[in-house]
Amino acid sequence: AVGNEVFANR
């Protein structure tokens, strides 16, 4: 989740 935590915020 490096720079993609907003997409893996489920």
UniProtKB/Swiss-Prot annotation:
Superkingdom: Eukaryota
Listed name of the protein: Unknown protein 12
Native source species: Ginkgo biloba
Lineage of the organism: Eukaryota, Viridiplantae, Streptophyta, Embryophyta, Tracheophyta
